[in-house]
Amino acid sequence: MIDQYKHQQLQIGLVSPQQIKAWANKNLPNGEVVGEVTRPSTFHYKTDKPEKDGLFCERIFGPIKSGICACGNSRASGAENEDERFCQKCGVEFVDSRIRRYQMGYIKLACPVTHVWYLKGLPSYIANLLDKPLKKLEGLVYGDFSFARPSTKKPTFLRLRGLFEEEIASCNHSISPFFSTPGFATFRNREIATGAGAIREQLADLDLRIIIENSLVEWKELEDEGYSGDEWEDRKRRIRKVFLIRRMQLAKHFIQTNVEPEWMVLCLLPVLPPELRPIVYRSGDKVVTSDINELYKRVIRRNNNLAYLLKRSELAPADLVMCQEKLVQEAVDTLLDSGSRGQPMRDGHNKVYKSLSDVIEGKEGRFRETLLGKRVDYSGRSVIVVGPSLSLHQCGLPLEIAIKLFQLFVIRDLITKRATSNVRIAKRKIWEKEPIVWEILQEVMRGHPVLLNRAPTLHRLGIQAFQPTLVEGRTISLHPLVCKGFNADFDGDQMAVHLPLSLEAQAEARLLMFSHMNLLSPAIGDPICVPTQDMLIGLYVLTIGNRRGICANRYNSCVNYPTKKVNYNMKDKEPHFSSSYDALGAYRQKLISLDSPLWLRWKLDQRVIGSREVPIEVQYESLGTYHEIYAHYLIVGNRKKEIRSIYIRTTLGHISFYRELEEAIQGFSQAYSYTI
């Protein structure tokens, strides 16, 4: 369909029976209206031509050959005279055969049928709106029981039963023969509602605005009651409150989309265009047909049998009619979702028939295989790797991908800056990779975001915007904190990069899709940018340190060298550093390793000074100074028992991790102060 802005779009939802007829019906010049499929036939076994009013009828779905009717006559396509657009003999319209890809038909059901998606889906929309248990609704739909139709204000037989229970017990001998009399059909139609027709009547009587008001009042009453102390009652109250919220949201959605609730019960069943459910003839008289055709045949046969029984309702037993209605309901359920009734339907070779749901859903379904995942212009694809130097809103694009994506922008700037005279010379400069090309490319990329997407895109965080930067190699660099939103890791995953062209698309990417603006999960509100997988392993390696404590003995605990003595000479002693910069400098000079224990001078902490912890060892020097050694820190004092400095026992990995946290907190504090 095409919206008001002339954008092609696909919309899935409920439609009215009038809309289904409008999709299928065609008015012939003789006044006949075609569009209803009434026969389960496909092709004639002798002529191999589509059967009239069948699943491949040319009058309903259009000609098989462009401009040629079923009789073999041809007319000029697009003739002005209305009578010349249709064959006078067979009634086939002279149009292009491609109409068979989108021209629909319909089956007029002899009884209403519930749509299995809305009855048995989770949550069940029908049960939600009617505020009734799903099991009772299923029993009503499949004829397990009936309910009294409140059509009049006078007491009916079923409602009088509660008033005269004792009298009914004495009249059982006269009630049973009544159900087999011809007058029972009239009584049943007037007093009893069963099947999907009963559901349709209840849905048609609903006032959605009253449902919203009543649900809101009940929710407020439950909210005011608070907690009773009974765990079971409180749990029931919470479940009821959640149900009321969902019911209000569903009713509001029906109102906003102008959809009537009774449309969830089908009176007309749409028939797909024949090109979407083809029959293919192969060599050796082999015929390959779509499973949808067999399921449509099953529906039409059962529906025709029910229509025949209803025409002769005076002779047909009521139980037989109800049983046939149940068969029609099950046939439509199998067509829409073959697994909805337990075991799916199988053919003679024990192969499961593929229903409409099976054709649509999954990786091999119509949407993901045929409509999604196609190649588009201004896009690329590559493996993702960690970019440790990137900010959260940045991604690294390889030179090869970047120059392809931004080629037109680079050519425009080359011509604008008079670096070249025409497009051909500009392309040659790009091909020869001249230095000016990379300068202009960086200028173009500086203000132009890109979109990164990882399939499958299951929620909105599966595609996010980033500020691109040029990197060497052929892989896309990504900040590890954004991996959870994409459900990605760095074990060979690939991601697609797209370039938004219009100003509207770029503005949307900057305002709504940038990664640093999507820090919380849109579903539950929990933080989505949290360390996972590779980042957790890196933090573990960074902070694991040397497990040998300060009180370790002089023998190495390594399994491979259980008796090797540790050499405690001057070189192997734990070094002392006055600042973290000195420790980092020693690491760059390869004087210490990442997990080597060291002593780092720390600010005087009153919690340490006032601690009552007993030192492990006290070392005195010749000048009167002393060192009090504890498990995780060291105090240096002078001869006057004054504390001169404190050293903590740590590793370079812990120092690096602490510095990163400190810088992040300072940056957040500055940003928060600017907003205030």
Swiss-Prot record:
Binding positions for Zn(2+) per the UniProt entry: 69, 71, 87, 90
Q: Where in the cell is it found?
A: Plastid, Chloroplast
Its family remark reads: Belongs to the RNA polymerase beta' chain family. RpoC1 subfamily.
* PANTHER family named among the record's database cross-references: DNA-DIRECTED RNA POLYMERASE (PTHR19376), DNA-DIRECTED RNA POLYMERASE SUBUNIT BETA (PTHR19376:SF54)
**GO cellular component, as recorded:** chloroplast; DNA-directed RNA polymerase complex; mitochondrion
EC code(s) of this entry:
2.7.7.6
Keyword terms:
Chloroplast, DNA-directed RNA polymerase, Magnesium, Metal-binding, Nucleotidyltransferase, Plastid, Transcription, Transferase, Zinc
Reaction equation(s) it catalyzes: RNA(n) + a ribonucleoside 5'-triphosphate = RNA(n+1) + diphosphate
Binding residues annotated for Mg(2+), in chain numbering: 489, 491, 493
Q: What is this protein called?
A: DNA-directed RNA polymerase subunit beta'
**From the UniProt record, which GO molecular function terms apply?**
DNA binding; DNA-directed RNA polymerase activity; magnesium ion binding; zinc ion binding
Can you tell which superkingdom this protein's organism belongs to? Eukaryota
Instruction: Supply the InterPro entries for this chain.
Output: DNA-dir_RpoC_beta_prime, RNA_pol_asu, RNA_pol_N, RNA_pol_Rpb1_1, RNA_pol_Rpb1_3_sf, RNA_pol_Rpb1_clamp_domain, RNApol_RpoC1
